[in-house]
């Protein structure tokens, strides 16, 4: 049973087709232009992202609750700075809203292949109130010049997005559209008996980075190896007990220091 059927039809959310009723989803093109990545923290699996975010859509003046840019980040860690920088109407009647976004995000890192591992730096956002029946986010491939993952990575690189990360190398970038399901009833009695999820349209931005293994080996493993070799050589030198103990203690402390 559809709640407030006539009101939904009046707002343009539902239309009649062959005597039946169907939801009319509004397509909203969404794009992300990455400007910077820094503060990658492997202990907390967090990272800071700075980027432009925009929405392009055809307005629906009949529906006062039609708010395509009413979005929320699903993997934000703390407050996210969102600054509107542009709102304009294009010649074809579509509306463009652009934001500058900066904040810390989280995606659980995996270290199975350490120190040769890859990590995914992810940004996810969804519409906060409208389900997929009313609003569908679609990746704005044209606006992002997203011809391929390699092209998108190159665009981000030209923006200087990777100039502040050290010890990591970007490998690929992609943007996908998906759904965010929830089984919450939101306290609405109409949802108490529902066994299916409520779906919200979601955009996922994924930047794959790989640890710079050579840099890690030169800066971390090589000094340890040299220290251990020098400590081993002392066993073949004509040194007294106290001298050997001092060299061994120094090697042990040096090894512990490099693991801090």
Regions found by a protein language model. Name each.
Residues 1-204:
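Soluble non-transmembrane domains of integral membrane proteins
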Residues 202-260:
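Channel- or pocket-lining gating/hinge segments that regulate access to a cavity or pore
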